Amino acid sequence: MIRDVLVGIVKGYRLLLSPWLGSSCRFEPTCSAYSLQALQTHGAAAGSYLTLTRLARCHPWCAGGSDPVPSEKPRFKSQLFTQLIHPSSEKKSS
């Protein structure tokens, strides 16, 4: 139920606000498409977490690029700061 409300909010944004604001997302897929995919794939909690970390990375100083929704659910106790600074595609494996 909560997931459906969040999906409705994102779809409302895409319908009402996005055409007025223009396309300024630096990532592929766009942040709103990413949000819809994350919510539908991982549910309300994990999808919201992924959406918020993605929005925090989408700024003028970010290189952007391809950043698909991960197939696995995120670990909430993992290194949040690192996830905000570096997209998952740019992380180096240890």
Curated annotation (Swiss-Prot):
Q: Does the keyword Cell membrane apply?
A: yes
Does Cell membrane appear among the keywords?
Answer: yes
Which Pfam families does the entry mention? YidD
User: What is the protein's major site of localization?
Assistant: membrane
Topological category with respect to the lipid bilayer: Peripheral membrane protein
Q: Which GO terms describe its cellular component?
A: plasma membrane
Provide the alphabetized UniProt keywords.
Answer: Cell inner membrane, Cell membrane, Membrane
Entry's localization field: Cell inner membrane
Protein family per UniProt:
Belongs to the UPF0161 family.
Question: What is this protein's function?
Answer: Could be involved in insertion of integral membrane proteins into the membrane.
Q: Can you name this protein?
A: Putative membrane protein insertion efficiency factor
**Source organism of the structure:** Albidiferax ferrireducens (strain ATCC BAA-621 / DSM 15236 / T118) (Rhodoferax ferrireducens)
